[in-house]
Regions:
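Non-catalytic N-terminal targeting/anchoring module and adjacent flexible stem/linker
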Residues: 1-4, 15
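Conserved catalytic core of two-metal-ion nucleotidyltransferases
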Residues: 12, 18-42, 87-135, 140, ...
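Active-site nucleotide-donor binding segment shared across nucleotidyl transfer reactions
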Residues: 38-71
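Helix N-cap motif at beta-to-alpha junctions
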Residues: 77-80
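A short, surface-exposed interaction/processing loop segment used at functional sites
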Residues: 150-156
């Protein structure tokens, strides 16, 4: 259906079918990566579920969104340590993961899993972590703000201004501002603070949850919708 839509649109070009077949090969590799993670999580009783576009694709398209190149899943922050430990000991040798626990150069708090031989920037399963929220709305807003601030401070500390390709000038300016803001803060202290804050409110004891990263104020959902 997607291919037919493109063929009948003004976006169609001569090499589309050939390029899309190549693209589907990468989609299959990502889907296989998800299968590996699914087995690992089931065997180790780690709670996870599809999220965002990946969840939409599973429901609407009975698989991946036709033009989506990655898969997104969410895991409770309380299970992060166990999940990372499982990746270290149980992930097949032909796969690898990228996270702050595995690579000191990592600038974000999500985890990416990919087949070896592929850059996690381009082919991956994105693992986002979610945290419960305090019941008081004002406290919940403060909590989400602190998670966002810690995430951006950490990213700015690790940001490579010499070699990094930024998506926009706004992103670059944002990183400069947070680098200055975090001048007197140690990277390890930011990470330790984040780990304490992100696990403060277990989802099972909370009515709502948010993403435990820079998009914490974008995603705020009832806890009954997960796990």
């Amino acid at each position: 259906e997607f291919v037919n839509e493109v063929q009948n649109s003004n976006q169609y070009y001569k090499e589309f079918e050939k390029e899309y077949k190549n693209f589907q090969i990468y989609q299959k590799k990502v889907a296989h990566t998800l299968q590996i993670l699914h087995t690992m999580c089931e065997e180790n009783e780690i709670h996870y579920q599809l999220a965002f576009g990946s969840l939409l694709g599973a429901i609407r398209d009975d698989g991946q969104i036709p033009w989506d190149y990655d898969v997104d899943i969410i895991i409770p922050t309380q299970e992060r340590e166990n999940f990372i430990d499982c990746l270290k000991h149980n992930l097949p040798q032909n796969f690898y993961f990228y996270s702050v626990e595995q690579d000191s150069a990592c600038e974000h708090f999500i985890t990416r899993v990919a087949p070896k031989g592929y850059d996690t920037h381009f082919l991956h399963v994105d693992v986002f972590y979610v945290a419960g929220l305090p019941e008081n709305q004002t406290e919940a807003q403060k909590y989400k703000h602190e998670i966002k601030e810690l995430t951006l401070l950490y990213k700015a500390k690790k940001f490579d201004f010499r070699n990094k390709k930024t998506s926009s000038k706004k992103e670059l300016c944002n990183m400069v501002a947070y680098r200055i803001k975090g001048t007197l803060k140690k990277t390890d202290d930011i990470l330790s603070r984040y780990n304490r804050i992100a696990t403060q409110y277990p989802i099972e004891n909370s009515q709502r949850y948010c993403l435990a990263d820079r998009f914490s104020d974008w995603y705020d959902f009832p806890s009954c919708t997960v796990f």
